[in-house]
A protein has these predicted regions:
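Generic recognition of well-ordered alpha-helical segments
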Residues: 14, 68-71, 125, 177-180, ...
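Residues at helix-coil transition
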Residues: 21, 78, 102-103, 125-128, ...
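ATP-binding pocket architecture of kinase catalytic cores
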Residues: 28-155, 159-173
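ATP/Mg2+ or Mg2+-diphosphate-binding catalytic cores
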Residues: 276-334
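Active-site acidic catalytic loop and adjacent metal/ATP-binding pocket
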Residues: 32-41, 47-52, 86, 94, ...
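An alpha-helical support segment within catalytic cores of ATP-dependent transferases
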Residues: 8-23, 133-197, 207, 255-258, ...
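Active-site activation/catalytic loop segments of kinase-like enzymes and analogous catalytic loops
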Residues: 225-258, 269-288, 303-312
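All-alpha amphipathic helical-bundle segments outside canonical DNA-binding/catalytic cores
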Residues: 87, 258-269
């Protein structure tokens, strides 16, 4: 481990050693699109397993500052929700230093159906606990409390719309169609605003239990039904098991009856956020962008939004025809 002095990894290591008064003895870059590292540091006899979560930046479609997630993690930890312990916030390079929690992501990797069901039950209990939290500490930290049915339904969608409008390189009829539909079909709800994870269903687990809730950068105050919708979108990439069972479990824990049309509406809203965020990247890709990966994300979540809209309006869609592969100089890469 001998990074160059001006290398980003070297800066991270130097900051950690200075902040913790420790010596970093191992460092591994996480294989993902945002900068992140797994590290081990020694401080006297103590051995610290660490994780540095770097800033995704606006170029990757982000709309929330990383400080937002740091404050969220602080407040959830204080409230007894299982989240990683925080060690500090680094200004350059920007990132959150936290505990490397034991466990793994992706419930599809559970050892068997019993473990999958046990973890799912535990997560739904945690989600119910999160939705029952007092919102005042989050409001004091800067989260905006919705005061109208439109704000409850649309949540942070206007933020994503503005970001898309500022960055878009060309018109996109699909995005315009879904956005207009969402504004025209704002649903009624009797739910009180709650803290919602937004991109729910992200956690680490071990031996049948959730060890930490993670990836809370999109969290806000809004309709708790939004987190049931978030489980659906997460399930597209990381299968979460029987979501009907999970939703029933949540209803029992909270003692409420969920309106499936509310969950459907939030599924459309949250699904289309991904295409809104990455369309400008697809149209003007920065160097080294995995363009095909972004294109896949665009169509997976755009299709999800359209299919749920069709379900809500009782329309029957023709199944898409398989696309024949076409050879090109780039085929070998994919």
């Amino acid at each position: 481990m001998s990074p160059q002095p001006n290398d980003e990894q070297s800066q991270v290591i130097q900051w950690i050693e200075s902040t913790l008064g420790a010596r970093v003895v191992a460092c591994e870059r996480q294989a993902r699109w945002r900068p992140a590292w797994f590290l081990v540091a020694e401080r006297g006899p103590e051995r610290l397993a660490l994780y540095f979560r770097g800033d995704r930046g606006l170029q990757q479609g982000g709309q929330y500052a990383l400080e937002h997630e740091y404050r969220i993690l602080e407040l959830l930890g204080q409230a007894g929700i299982p989240v990683p312990t925080l060690y500090g916030f680094c200004d350059s390079p920007r990132g959150i230093l936290m505990e490397q929690v034991p466990g793994r992501a992706n419930l599809a990797t559970a050892t068997d159906e019993n473990e999958r069901a046990s973890v799912q039950d535990h997560y739904m209990q945690i989600l119910a606990d999160i939705h029952a939290l007092d919102t005042e500490p989050f409001e004091s930290a800067g989260l905006v409390r919705p005061t109208s049915k439109s704000q409850m339904a649309l949540a942070d969608f206007p933020i994503w719309e503005r970001g898309y409008a500022q960055a878009k390189a060309r018109p996109d009829a699909l995005l315009a169609f879904v956005s207009q539909w969402l504004h025209r079909n704002v649903p009624e709800t009797d739910a009180a605003p709650s803290f919602v994870c937004a991109d729910s269903g992200q956690f680490l687990f071990d031996q049948g239990r959730v060890t930490a809730v993670i990836d809370l950068e999109l969290a806000h105050l809004g309709d708790p039904a939004a987190d049931l919708a978030g489980l659906r979108t997460r399930d597209l990439s990381e299968p979460l098991g029987d979501l009907r069972r999970a939703t029933q479990r949540y209803s029992e824990l909270r003692g409420i009856t969920l309106d499936p049309r509310l969950i459907d509406y939030h599924t459309v809203r949250f699904s289309i956020v991904t295409p809104l965020a990455i369309a400008p990247i697809l149209h003007r890709p920065p160097p080294e962008t995995d363009w095909v990966q972004y294109l896949c994300w665009y169509w997976v979540y755009a299709r999800a939004a359209l299919e749920v809209m069709a379900h809500m309006t009782r329309m029957t869609l023709d199944p898409p025809k398989p696309i024949e592969a076409t050879l090109s100089p780039y085929s070998a890469g994919y």
